[in-house]
């Protein structure tokens, strides 16, 4: 058995998706921190007693380790909910960076939602990068789609990987997902991302009530109107495809804009899609903490179960979640998919095994690559952030490094 040589601290660990992936890759997680009690219970049951309950906005003694990993809470700028720029949790990104700069581990991994890039006009990006570059870290910061790493869902996230005085690599894609940028090229050499059906087909029939044969694999009975909506929706369709009499009142109010005389005009894009039936042969839409009941099973007339959501996040069936159903969905939806974490960890482990301490260069912090988009189009808000990063960290014109596709 290979000895676990490299140690890890997992800050803001949640249910432990990052820790699980890093453990499977061969790292040893020696300390994990969170403040949400269901997360602490879930982590302790599945991954070990090295988890601690603590508010990381307050002082704490952290153990020295090879790497620090983590995803500071994103609720203040998540697109899954209302953005709140004054949410105190936003400042935890800077706290995370300062922990790394002070402890000076050999490497770090950071994960967050795509809204992180444009939050506060790019201030959160600077809050992350400034202390780390000053401390000597050489950093890749890229937006990725977890589907390109074999996770059966289109999940766009921001990943940063850094090495202290040495140059880490960024993990290569392992799969190609239909509709993902570069899919027409990658499909020639990479296997397709698993579909929803491939990910879920070995689960037994969902029970009609808890506890179920597998934890979380049950579905409540639908109301009459919910059943009618489910029966009417075909794979790929959403609430806006329903006849008006089946649409939810709140959807109708927001889906129609009114002109001066009060007459409703045509439906607009940007209205909430409400429930949606997933396509069986595609990866899922992103699983989020607040989506319970939103996604309908591709064929069955019911929402996805909690366990099906966990599977789409690549948690094993024997991974037990604590708390009520809302807590469990929050833990699952906020987690880093363990499979994505494992790919990142394996790549970092290979880098560390190749790293020669003599290659260390003092005070050589820099941004090695910055890839803030997966498409050719750039919004004004994102263009502002790109310009901000270029002016702050790059001394020569290297736009191709900023818009890297690989």
Please give the residue ranges for each predicted region:
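Core alpha/beta nucleotide-donor-binding catalytic domains of modification enzymes
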Residues: 2-106, 110, 114-118, 123-126, ...
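Short beta-strands and strand-loop turn motifs
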Residues: 109-113, 142, 322
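S-adenosyl-L-methionine-dependent DNA methyltransferase catalytic core
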Residues: 1-9, 13-27, 157-331, 335-406
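Conserved S-adenosyl-L-methionine
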Residues: 52-54, 114, 137-148
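A short, glycine/Asx- and small/polar-enriched loop/turn
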Residues: 63, 152-157
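Short, solvent-exposed loop/turn segments at secondary-structure junctions
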Residues: 73-75, 114-115, 147-149, 165-167, ...
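A SAM-dependent methyltransferase catalytic signature shared across enzymes that methylate proteins
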Residues: 128-143, 164-168
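A short beta-turn/loop motif at secondary-structure boundaries
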Residues: 149-152, 278
């Amino acid at each position: 058995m290979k000895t676990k040589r490299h140690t890890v601290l997992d800050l803001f660990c949640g249910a432990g998706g990052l820790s699980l992936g890093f453990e499977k890759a061969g790292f040893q997680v020696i300390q994990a921190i969170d403040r949400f009690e269901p997360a602490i219970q879930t982590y302790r049951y599945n991954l070990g007693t090295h988890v601690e309950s603590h508010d990381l906005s307050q002082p704490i003694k952290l153990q020295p380790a090879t790497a620090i990993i983590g995803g500071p809470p994103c609720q203040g700028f998540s697109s899954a909910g209302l953005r709140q720029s004054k949410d105190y949790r936003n400042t935890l990104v800077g706290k995370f960076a300062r922990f790394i700069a002070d402890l000076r581990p050999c490497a770090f991994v950071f994960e967050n939602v795509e809204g992180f890039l444009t939050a506060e006009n790019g201030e959160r990006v600077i809050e992350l990068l400034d202390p780390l570059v000053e401390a000597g870290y050489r950093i890749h910061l890229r937006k990725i789609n977890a589907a390109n790493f074999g996770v059966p869902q289109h999940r766009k996230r921001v990943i940063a990987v850094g090495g202290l005085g040495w140059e880490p690599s960024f993990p290569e894609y392992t799969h190609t997902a239909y509709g993902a940028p570069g899919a027409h090229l990658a499909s020639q050499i990479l296997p397709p991302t698993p579909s929803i059906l491939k990910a879920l087909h070995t689960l037994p029939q969902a029970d009609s009530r808890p506890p179920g044969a597998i934890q979380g694999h049950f579905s409540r009975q639908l109301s009459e109107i919910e059943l009618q909506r489910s029966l009417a929706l075909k794979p790929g369709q959403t609430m806006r495809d329903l006849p008006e009499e089946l649409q939810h009142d709140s959807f109708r109010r927001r889906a129609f804009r009114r002109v001066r005389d009060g007459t409703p005009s045509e439906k607009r894009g940007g209205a909430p899609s409400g429930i949606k039936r997933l396509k069986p042969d595609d990866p899922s839409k992103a699983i989020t903490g607040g989506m319970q009941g939103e996604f309908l099973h591709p064929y069955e007339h019911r929402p996805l179960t909690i366990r099906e959501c966990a599977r789409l996040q690549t948690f094993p069936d024997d991974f037990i979640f604590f708390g009520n159903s809302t807590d469990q969905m929050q833990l699952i939806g906020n987690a880093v998919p363990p499979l994505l974490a494992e790919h990142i960890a394996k790549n970092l482990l290979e880098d560390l095994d190749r790293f020669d301490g003599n290659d260390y260069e003092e005070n050589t912090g820099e941004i090695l690559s910055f890839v803030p988009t997966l498409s050719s189009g750039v919004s004004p808000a994102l263009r502002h952030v790109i310009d901000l990063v270029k002016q702050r960290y790059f001394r020569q014109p290297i736009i191709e490094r900023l818009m890297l596709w690989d």
